[in-house]
Amino acid sequence: MRVFLFMLDPVQKLKGKNIKKQAKKEQKIKGKAWKMWKMYGFCGVLIFHNADGIQSAIKSWQMEGFKVAFVPTMGALHEGHLALVERAAHLPQVRVVCSIFVNPTQFNDPADLRAYPRNPARDLHLLSEQGLADALFQPEIDEVYPPEHPCMTFSFGALEEVMEGAMRPGHFAGVGQVVARLLHLVQADYLLLGEKDYQQFLVVRDLLRQLQENQLRLRDEKRQSSPFSGPSGDGFYNPEERARGADEPLEPDELTWHKIPELIMGTTHRDEGGLALSSRNQRLSNEGRLKARQIYAALQHARRRWTLESPDETVQKILLMLAEVPDFRVEYIQLADSDTLAAVREWGNHSSVRIFAAVWIEGVRLIDNTVVFP
């Protein structure tokens, strides 16, 4: 619990240690912010709806020697999200930014987008009650995808051709777009994602690699086009000047510029029966939640039996176990290499293996995964 809750939309430039004082002044003249303050009382969350506000806050924190840990979400927060925020808060010398943005470009089914649970008041209450997030970024769609700027596009090769990528065409292209845009807006030092969406984690890891390569390419092009380019054509007159510019970043207002954060994975959080926590669980009945616990119970069979069965036998037994659960419709059960997601045909060909599942129940699609070995 650090300061009052302030609604900053838009926010004035916040400088140095005056950020909280200026924010307090700002909220006093915002009727909407005042109502929100009365609703939620004291907490430590600054709320921003535009890039100028969050970027001003981040610059202020950086001037004070803090780094930024970023937890992007689509809202409908649960204990798994809060655990990521808590892990972020325990990183050294950080300020924690959580975002809520339901990204339309990663939904291949419009009905799924419409049905996605949204409860911003509850989300804010959870963050406020926890008291570990320093800022909540809730951008509008035009802030994330400005009409005047085309979106960057990404290809993730084999990572997007299996499981979620195969079943949800265009899903990971949308994930790449939104993560790239949010990282451009937030400029974080750390990016925290959950283990439950493990395939997404690998996709984002590859996205960061591509952004790093893109930034190096842009830096080289900038040097090549410099009017001060020397005989070497690299944009520098001499070795001393070249050395000074070796780590020179591009201007942060360029659409394609990104700070490349350190990627951190948080462990999957489960209820007392093993069901992986998910925003989609809110759409299940109590009976549906009880049945859904059988997903993780079945996946654990692979960890217990992999030394005694072939990969194909393991998958078939899990399918039989889930077929006995009423109202289940299994979309896939897949054994995959933990690093490449290549299908596992023989245990000995892989140093680390996970098993993945996608199952429908009560019209809700649930995914889960767990380590088989090591």
Question: Over which residues does each language-model region extend?
Answer:
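Nucleotidyltransferase catalytic core that binds NTPs
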Residues: 38-226, 231, 235-327, 336, ...
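Cationic, amphipathic, low-complexity segments that mediate targeting or membrane/lipid association
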Residues: 7, 11, 15-16, 26-31
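Cationic, low-complexity basic patches in intrinsically disordered or flexible, solvent-exposed regions
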Residues: 14, 22, 27, 225, ...
